[in-house]
């Protein structure tokens, strides 16, 4: 699936390709995707496609016969699916009843300077932190990967984002116009909840937590990035292939 277009260009190409076409005019890949998300509909139906709302999880909104489906689009490797200030994320953790001692351990991992607020004078890398405090990371992971919490994280990172007022993703599409892999919201949740992901870093199922920039050299130009957490889905394509295989075997 070699492709040099950027993520935004790819989204634009998908929208432009789909918009105002009849289903029967699509290539086999896109026809299959449309039938997946809309079910068995008339091939004479005309597709309306547009960009999702700025800052929200759906990248593309598809409407056919007044039925709306919201799609998150991904491509390439090392897919970053979410980022926000760590202080906002900590407030979210409190709101879903993550114990305060777990939040404290997460903040100490995030800042890597012996404090839970980033004021320490010595900073260490994620690798060094794991060498010293792997037990704390394991405790965090045990809590984060409980089913009730995983569902909250998947909703925040992939499906809806930071506000309950935001639109919710119906399906995730990985690829371009010519070739793609996909899964519905329910398939993704079921896959993440029902599988064990053994990682030595902080994770939420197959999604991994990282700091945008630990700023180990105290560079004032990147200091603000130290305040931001990111979530990546490095195994996205492989996980979608597994979901597709499971779907075909049902």
Regions found by a protein language model. Name each.
Residues 1-58, 62-69, 74-250:
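Short, positively charged
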């Amino acid at each position: 699936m070699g492709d040099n277009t950027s993520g935004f260009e790819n989204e634009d190409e998908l929208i432009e390709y789909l918009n105002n076409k009849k289903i029967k005019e699509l290539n086999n890949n896109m026809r299959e995707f449309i039938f997946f998300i809309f079910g068995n509909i008339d091939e004479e139906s005309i597709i309306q496609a547009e960009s999702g709302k700025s800052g929200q999880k759906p990248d593309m909104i598809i409407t056919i016969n007044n039925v709306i489906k919201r799609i998150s689009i991904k491509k390439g490797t090392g897919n970053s699916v979410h980022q926000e200030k760590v202080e906002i994320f900590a407030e979210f953790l409190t709101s879903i009843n993550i114990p305060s001692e777990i939040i404290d351990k997460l903040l100490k991992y995030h800042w890597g300077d012996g404090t839970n607020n980033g004021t320490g004078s010595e900073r260490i890398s994620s690798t060094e932190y794991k060498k010293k405090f792997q037990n704390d990371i394991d405790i965090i992971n045990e809590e984060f990967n409980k089913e009730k919490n995983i569902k909250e994280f998947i909703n925040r990172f992939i499906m809806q984002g930071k506000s309950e007022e935001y639109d919710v993703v119906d399906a995730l599409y990985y690829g371009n116009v010519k070739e793609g892999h996909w899964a519905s919201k329910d398939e993704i949740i079921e896959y993440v909840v029902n599988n064990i992901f053994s990682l030595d870093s902080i994770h939420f199922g197959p999604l991994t937590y990282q700091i945008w920039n630990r700023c180990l050299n105290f560079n004032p130009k990147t200091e603000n990035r130290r305040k931001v957490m990111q979530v990546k889905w490095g195994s996205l394509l492989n996980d979608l292939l597994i979901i597709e295989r499971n779907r075909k075997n049902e």
